């Protein structure tokens, strides 16, 4: 019985030590676009109105075996609360198609995280509302 408890304890420890997710983010590893970042931003501005676009990259390793590479796009939009959910969904479809058409090394990316943010600052108080949508690229 003592050996069984020891075996069970060690098995449980090994299980929980191996089941973890590590997310790495690098600010200097921006993805490349066929038309450059500024050109990509201009093409998106033709479709819909936003104040600022931030582009980033992330890598997630799950259980040490599978790896997920993704693209982060954050759009600063005024009056986000007035935009309907169906319009947000149509925006994400357009953004996904533009990314597929303009992203270099598309096969290296699995997902795109699209975030729409509205920031309101009053004195020391900063309030951020956001909508986050994850779409598969391939």
Predicted features, each with a name:
Residues 15-18:
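C-terminal motif of bacterial Sec signal peptides marking the signal peptidase cleavage site
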Residues 20-23:
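Bacterial signal peptide processing site
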Residues 25-80, 104-138:
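Polar/charged, Gly/Pro-rich intrinsically disordered segments
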Residues 84-107:
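Short, non-transmembrane amphipathic alpha-helical segments
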